[in-house]
Amino acid sequence: MNKLINDYLTKMGAMYTFELDSEFNETVKTRGMENFVYNSFSEGQKYRIDISILFAWRDLVRLISGSRVNVLVLDEVMDGSSDTDGIDALVEILDHIDDSIYVISHSEKIEAMEFDRTIDVQMNGKFSEIKISV
């Protein structure tokens, strides 16, 4: 698990490593090998750790179960406190996944990103309007 997490952290440009022990206590080490706790990091750094853990769990479940789920739904992962570099790194990871990916977002910054198709849902009074762009 730790190897998977750190592989994703590397892809996200993190300059630190993350480890979980058998009781799921975390240790975060910088290049100088100083130990830190998760809450001592910036929101952007925590975002990278969170995304790395998410993808590591996904990979681990695939390895253990032997089944291949081909849908990935990410709800508001680009709406939080990540910086532009963190979001760019996430998009790069998503570009290498062959599954159907659904990114749900309320952020306007996602509109500038290139996706194969977008479904825009807007409230119009008491009803929702749906626009599909290809």
Each PLM stretch: what is its role?
Residues M1-V134:
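Terminal ABC-like ATPase head and other globular end-domains that cap long coiled-coil arms
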